[in-house]
Design a protein with these regions (language model features):
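Short, acidic, metal-binding catalytic loop of nucleotide-sugar glycosyltransferases
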Residues: 41-50
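Catalytic core of nucleotide-sugar-dependent glycosyltransferases
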Residues: 209-210, 214-217, 223-250
């Protein structure tokens, strides 16, 4: 484990009877002193007993970590690790790396889990190998009440918006296959993770019973910052260019619901075909992603009306030049 991670309890977590847990509940923790005890208790009250709770304190400045330390001293299923503040993606990746369960369940430190959800979700994954994700029906708590009405899963919809909450049970092998949570993206990390896991196939099952209680508080994140939204969309387009091409006919747009229409209208203006040698698949992927990667990656070698940038792709160094249309006067002269 990274040197920057500090673990309070050196012994690995185990179930109440000392066996290796089947389910690892991972919980990022940042300044949730008022809620984290109830969140952990809701997990420990689960009817499914073969579980562990791995909490990663993401540089909290309140008493959150102390609350978890006290719980860990009295229940061997709870373990606390510390890291410098690096965000929930890093915290989740660290938690999974320290965990031992076959199945992974993210739970936020200010939410609550229903007693029956884990048992019901494990039964689905055990019996249906084609299912990759089992999600709960969710109710709001805190400053909002009622049902969180999320639509049924479809890849086409997932390309435009995330409709799978963070709390959903999945297999460790799928986590490893996609490389965990992307630590480059600054928001909507769950959206990126579900795209990575599901874009090549797999079913999503939603259980009909309420299995999770999502807390809405005054500082709950919103996707309204324009720069943050642009960053998220740019990162998703870079990481999942082929997926968006398949589902939306082109990149995800700032007006996400209109992406297919915008792409259909602008298709005549876009490049038509990418041709690369079959022996160089990393280069092929790089070329397909160039429209979104050129302006924000690589090292600029030359800049005038056109720019030249250098990129490292695997073991290769590629030099790419962009060609912009000349200004109106130059077009007339030419």
């Amino acid at each position: 484990m990274d040197e920057g991670i500090r673990q309070d309890l050196t012994a690995p977590t185990s179930t109440a009877d000392g066996s290796t847990p089947l389910v690892s509940v991972i919980m990022p923790l940042y300044n949730a002193e008022a809620y984290v005890e109830a969140a952990i208790h809701s997990v420990l009250a689960s009817s499914f007993r073969s579980l562990e709770v791995v909490v990663v304190d993401d540089g909290s400045t309140d008493g959150s970590a102390k609350v978890v330390e006290t719980l860990a001293e009295t229940d061997r299923r709870v373990r606390l690790l510390h890291q410098a503040n690096a965000g929930p993606c890093r915290a989740r990746n660290v938690a999974v790396a320290a965990s031992r369960g076959r199945y992974i369940l993210p739970v936020d430190a200010d939410d609550l889990l229903a007693p029956s959800f884990i048992a019901d979700a494990v039964a689905v994954l055990d019996q249906q190998p084609e299912v990759k994700v089992v999600r709960p029906t969710i109710d709001f708590i805190g400053e909002r009440s009622g049902r969180w009405h999320l639509p049924d899963f479809s890849l086409r919809l997932l390309a435009r918006r995330n409709h799978i909450a963070a709390c959903a049970l999945y297999r460790r092998e799928d986590f490893d296959r996609v490389g965990g949570y992307c630590e480059e993206i600054k928001a909507r990390e769950d959206w990126d993770f579900w795209i990575s896991m599901l874009k090549h196939g797999g079913k999503v099952v939603r259980l009909p019973e309420v299995g999770y209680y999502y807390r809405v508080v005054a500082h709950s994140k919103r996707f309204r910052d324009r720069k943050l939204a642009a960053h998220v969309i740019r990162t998703l387009n870079i990481r999942h260019a082929a997926f968006f091409e398949q589902q939306l006919g082109g990149p995800l747009r700032r007006m996400r619901s209109w992406s297919r229409w915008i792409n259909a209208l602008t298709r005549p203006l876009r490049y038509r075909k990418t041709v690369t040698a079959e022996v160089a698949p990393p280069v092929k992927q790089f070329v397909e992603e160039l429209p979104w990667r050129f302006a924000s990656e690589g090292r600029e070698i030359f800049k005038n009306r056109n720019a030249i940038r250098r990129f490292e792709v695997g073991e290769d160094t590629l030099v790419v030049k962009e060609f912009c249309l000349p200004h109106a006067f130059n077009r007339f002269v030419y």
